[in-house]
Amino acid sequence: MNDGSMGPGRMSTGSISSGSIGADSLVVGQVVAEAEFSLSRDCLVRYAGASGDFNPIHYRDDVAQSVGLPGVLAHGMLTMGIAVQPVVDWIGDPGKILDYQVRFTRPVLVDAAEGAVVTILATVGALDTETNVARIDLTVTFGGVTVLGKAQVRVSLA
């Protein structure tokens, strides 16, 4: 298990075989992947360096609280990125992602000592057998609460 000190750590994961996936081998409602990622404050600082987003609400409690936030928040794009990773792992090729959209509904608070655990469940939301495209719906939660709304990934199954 990765404690998240080097980056978002995958704590557990599962997916159906991504061998030769076609729309005819899937059903709406089927779970295709699930994962948990641990985030630490170190992850946030490293992500800030990679992204260039050094807003101190992502690493300083005093600044976050001074602007009315309950604590340090994970970067939205970091949350969005880790949320799609189980789908990329399942489909086997990031180039098969045709579209990815989310709504940010709640922040992920990253405690200085305990960090945060983000849970992702990916299910088939719709299938188009003519184009061999699937819509994968993501349920992304932190502390049992959904943090990304209408998180959907369109993937090519060809």
Stretch-by-stretch model annotation:
Residues 1-6, 11, 18-32, 110-158:
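HotDog/MaoC-like acyl-thioester-processing domains
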Residues 11, 16-74:
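Catalytic strand-loop segment that frames the active site of acyl-thioester-processing enzymes
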Residues 34, 40, 44, 59, ...:
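Amphipathic, positively biased hydrophobic alpha-helical segments used for protein targeting
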Residues 37, 107, 129:
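Residues that form or immediately flank small-molecule/cofactor binding pockets and catalytic motifs
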Residues 39, 104, 155-157:
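Hydrophobic residues in beta-strands and at strand termini
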Residues 51-52, 64, 98-100, 116, ...:
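Short, charged/polar low-complexity linear motifs in solvent-exposed/disordered segments
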Residues 70, 79-121:
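Hydrophobic beta-strand-centered segment that forms part of the acyl-chain substrate-binding groove
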Residues 74, 96, 130-132:
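Short loop/turn segments at connectors of secondary-structure elements within structured domains
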